[in-house]
């Protein structure tokens, strides 16, 4: 019998122990559950306690009994239980491997709850491939902020499968762009940026204020496959409303410069079809 499994840390896509899931189908790339992530000696590990306010970010897989048996061996000394996992298409119940709090005494807590982001920051990864799908496809605000030099090396139009561009971040003047992992296909601009550009992007996207969160996706651009590209997703998603005109202009300007005419028209039609807030 197959089970849903929530994985984090080195079991995630493109990480060093992902081969243990080689025969398992990925159900959700963007998933989270309540808890704390620690950088333990043998690798990242999850801890649950009553005070947990944060989330652990990972992926959901459908695993058979053989896969679960292999993971039981890999996670010797760990505990296993089912948890509620949040995805863009609803709540799921999945197995997770975790440690007791005492087992992580002295280990560093990964405050973001995201192993991929922790790796990017701790290794000062350079360059970074950044997938922009909203107003960052346009360079007007880059120039105004004096940071356009960070974005002078665009790879160009990129296609992301499994996601759809939506407008779920509600503001007083209208919405802002987001992506939902709902099985669709979307387009954006892939930039090659230096590590030093992150401070600007994190501030603009409101990472500290929990507006958007860093996430990682695989895209196709110029006939090549780019793995673990940085992007930003809305944390508190609401029903879609129309974006304000000034924001829509930025999106359309960037889309017309980089994206396919068919997708650009589709995106315009969608924005124009949304109700005013």
UniProtKB/Swiss-Prot annotation:
User: Is-annotated flag, keyword Glycoprotein?
Assistant: no
Q: What is its EC number?
A: 2.3.2.-
Q: What does the record give as the active site?
A: 205
Please report any disulfide bonds recorded for this protein chain, giving both cysteine positions. none
Which key words tag this protein in UniProt?
Acyltransferase, Transferase
Which residues are listed for substrate binding in this entry?
8-11
CDD domains referenced in this protein's UniProt entry, alphabetically: GGCT_like (cd06661)
Quote the cellular component terms of the Gene Ontology held in the record.
cytosol
Q: Name one GO molecular function term.
A: acyltransferase activity
PANTHER family in UniProt? GAMMA-GLUTAMYLAMINECYCLOTRANSFERASE (PTHR12510:SF4), TROPONIN C-AKIN-1 PROTEIN (PTHR12510)
Q: Which family does it belong to?
A: Belongs to the gamma-glutamylcyclotransferase family.
Q: What is its biological role?
A: Putative gamma-glutamylcyclotransferase.
User: What name does this protein carry?
Assistant: Putative gamma-glutamylcyclotransferase YkqA
Q: State which gene encodes it.
A: ykqA
């Amino acid at each position: 019998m197959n089970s849903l499994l929530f994985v984090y840390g080195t079991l995630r896509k493109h990480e060093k122990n992902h081969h243990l899931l080689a025969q398992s189908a990925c159900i959700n790339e963007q998933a989270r559950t309540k808890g704390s992530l620690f950088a333990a000696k043998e690798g990242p590990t999850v801890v649950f306690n009553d005070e947990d306010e944060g989330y652990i970010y990972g992926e959901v897989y459908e695993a058979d009994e053989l896969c679960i048996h292999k993971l039981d061996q890999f996670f010797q000394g760990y505990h296993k239980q089912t948890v509620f996992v949040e995805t863009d298409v609803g709540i799921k119940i999945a197995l997770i491997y975790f440690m007791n709090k005492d087992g992580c005494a002295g280990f560093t807590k990964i405050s973001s709850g995201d192993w991929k982001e922790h790796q990017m920051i701790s290794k000062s990864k350079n360059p970074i491939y950044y997938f922009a799908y909203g107003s960052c496809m346009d360079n007007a605000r880059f120039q105004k902020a004096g940071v356009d030099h960070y974005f002078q090396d665009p790879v160009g139009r990129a296609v992301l499968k499994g996601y759809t561009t939506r407008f779920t971040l509600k503001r007083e003047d209208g919405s802002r762009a987001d992506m939902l992992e709902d099985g669709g296909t979307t387009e954006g601009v892939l930039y090659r940026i230096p590590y030093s550009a992150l401070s600007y992007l994190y501030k603009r996207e409101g990472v500290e204020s929990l507006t958007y969160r860093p996430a990682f996706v695989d895209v196709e651009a110029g006939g090549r496959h780019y793995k673990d590209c940085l992007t930003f997703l809305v944390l508190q998603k609401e029903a879609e409303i129309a974006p304000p005109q000034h924001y829509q202009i930025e999106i359309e300007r960037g889309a017309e410069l980089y994206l396919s005419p068919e997708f650009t028209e589709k995106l315009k039609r969608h924005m124009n079809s949304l109700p005013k807030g």
